[in-house]
Amino acid sequence: MQWQDHGMIVSMTPYGDTRSILSVFTRNHGICNAMIRLNKKKQSLQIGDRVCVTWRARLANNLGYFNSCEIISSAFYAYFQDHSKLLCLSSVTSTIYKSVPTNDAHPILYDYLIEFAEAAECGGHWYNEYLKLELEILSQLGFALDLSRCAVYHCEDNLLYISPKTGRAISERAGVSYRHLLFPLPQILRDLHNGTHTEQCSRKEFLLCLQILGYFLHRHLLSDDSKFLEQRKEMTALIYEEEAF
C-alpha cells in the first residue's frame, strides 16, 4: 500500500542511530506514525515542519515507512526568533498528537492548523487563527463550546459568562448570582466561535481566551498530561511579559 499527502510533523521519536518514528498530521489520512531513515538532510526535520510525505507499507495497519519526506516550510526559520509563537506551535502540535486518534482524518482541523501556521510564518497577526484552531480541536473531538445563546434562558443578548461544567454561554441575568463560579465570556471568543469577527484580538483578550480554552482542553482531552498545564502557564507568562515590555 502507498499514498502521498501533505501534513505537519507533530512528534519525532529517535529509533536507533539512523532512524526515527515520525508522526505527521496529514490532511487526508490523519495522524500517521511511520519509520523514516535519516540522512544529513532529514536530520534537520523538526516538529512543526510542513511536509509532503509518501507512506508505504505491506498492510494498512502496519507501521510502514515514509519513503520520502520533503519539507514545504521549515518551523525553525519561521519561529526561532519569536518564543511565544514557538510555544503556541509546540502546544498545539502536542495537543493534536495526544488527542486526535491515529489514522482518523480531520481535514477541517488540518486546514485550521495550516491557517494558523501561515499567519504565524508571514509575521502578521496570528492570535485569532490560534484561538480558532483550539476551538476547532474541541469541536472536532466532540467537546464543542456553545457560545451562541444562553444555556438557561436561550437568549442571544448580554452573554457575559461561560459555564466551566458545560462549556455553554450564560447571560448576565442567569449568571449574576453565580458569577464567581463562571468564566467571563470574552466577546472575541464568542465572535470567533460564531464566525462573525474580523478584527484581531488584543494580547489581553488572547491571554484570557488561552486560560479558558486551556481549561476545557485539559478537562476533556488532556487530563492525564501534567505538562500541558505547565506549558500553558509558560505561554501566558511569556505573552504577559511581552505586553508589559
Swiss-Prot record:
This is DNA repair protein RecO. Pfam families: RecO_C, RecO_N. Keywords: DNA damage, DNA recombination, DNA repair. It comes from Anaplasma phagocytophilum (strain HZ). Transmembrane segments: none annotated. GO terms for cellular component: bacterial nucleoid. It comes from the Bacteria. The gene is recO. Involved in DNA repair and RecF pathway recombination. PANTHER family: DNA REPAIR PROTEIN RECO. GO terms for biological process: DNA recombination; double-strand break repair. Belongs to the RecO family. HAMAP family: RecO (MF_00201). SUPFAM superfamilies: ArfGap/RecO-like zinc finger.
